[in-house]
Structure formats: C-alpha cells, structure tokens
C-alpha cells in the first residue's frame, strides 16, 4: 500500500 511504500522509501534513505 501507499503507507508501506513511504516507510520502505524512508528505510532506503536511512
């Protein structure tokens, strides 16, 4: 879902 994508993107940035 959209929220999961945002979290995944944040994890990649960190």
Swiss-Prot record:
Keyword Transmembrane helix: no
Tissue: Expressed by the skin glands.
Location, primary (coarse class): secreted
Subcellular location, record wording: Secreted
Keywords associated with the record: Amidation, Amphibian defense peptide, Antibiotic, Antimicrobial, Fungicide, Secreted
Residue positions, PTM Methionine amide: 14
Any single Gene Ontology cellular-component annotation: extracellular region
Any one of the GO BP annotations: defense response to fungus
Family statement: Belongs to the frog skin active peptide (FSAP) family. Temporin subfamily.
Protein name: Temporin-1Lb
Organism: Rana luteiventris (Columbia spotted frog)
């Amino acid at each position: 879902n959209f929220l999961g994508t945002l979290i995944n993107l944040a994890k990649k940035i960190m």
